[in-house]
């Protein structure tokens, strides 16, 4: 449906505590809408929204939605949700989160960042650059920016930067002026009936919905995007480590948790020297995508370089949380949201490069039974790269258990060599005690996953650090 601002004054948000819906609610509040919402329990997102004026109840009994002009929901809301059913009965217009976002973006020059991995950091880095360059953007990303402590902002400038979600194919609501895709991977295949080719074709459709005079920015290191690039009718800009990328990363090196590299591009006679306050080649790629877009909008180069150098990152993306005190020293605790084998691999590589002499203890909470089943072999391979694996039970994210796709099944798939350095912790609350027993001074402890593993971080550092 189209969003008519003359009649839409009150929006009700189902699952308002989720990062995506909470960011949308924040933008609506700052645009003057009355926002009500519901969720099962309070969290930092709901607390932030309540301070901004949102009216939130913590149940889904269907009583709070009846007076709204429209209701917004995410893919996390099931068809039998009482509020969703009440809205349908009351004939209240229902919009998916992505549909409402796309409606808001129509008022601006829009930039949509998609991809299986890296889209939150890239969109956050891009938003930070636009702010630093005084372009006063509106943005909505899939994580809390560490500098502003918010996933959203309403500015007075011409640009709207948003993360585009392929997990439920809702990015098809968007018709951006600039579209970015960081990579394409076999994830969220349940949305695409298990058909990777259908996923690929959906990405092509998304990119072809870019404005006729718009720009598509693709990472040429990704084999699927390399295949797609020549098929597109829009102007394409490529980036990557690949020698034939238009924006090419060269001379990459990592010093501690900082990255140094150069970008060769058709816009410059001399390479651009970039310092990034984040580790990992994957973040160098993210910064290169930002650089390509900055050139498209003719951003001031000194402002761009400053923004990349001082970008503080996104919460739960290689975030250093503190130290856990041990009897004879301390262990450093890092939290990372990555939950796909390729994301785990990138996190481990960045940590190894930052602390090559220190032991890596990876605490991994698998996310969704379906993903664990579909990528079991890939998980086994990447988890073998750590020095000690602490495996938690699968975080269901609302899915029913799948036989052969739980934590114990993953443990059984590990090799004999891996079994000697693997600990299975079925209950999250037992994790602090387990880590106290197995950790050594100077360990790097990485808490990895998109589920509720983050809830233990504060207790872990406060109790033991």
Swiss-Prot record:
Catalytic activities: UDP-N-acetyl-alpha-D-muramate + L-alanine + ATP = UDP-N-acetyl-alpha-D-muramoyl-L-alanine + ADP + phosphate + H(+)
Keyword match Nucleus: no
Known pathway: Cell wall biogenesis; peptidoglycan biosynthesis
Compartments, record wording: Cytoplasm
A GO CC annotation given for this chain: cytoplasm
Recorded GO MF terms: ATP binding; UDP-N-acetylmuramate-L-alanine ligase activity
One Pfam family hit: Mur_ligase_C
Function: Cell wall formation.
Matching NCBIfam families: murC
Family recorded in the similarity comment: Belongs to the MurCDEF family.
Name this polypeptide is given: UDP-N-acetylmuramate--L-alanine ligase
Species of the source: Coxiella burnetii (strain CbuG_Q212)
Gene (UniProt): murC
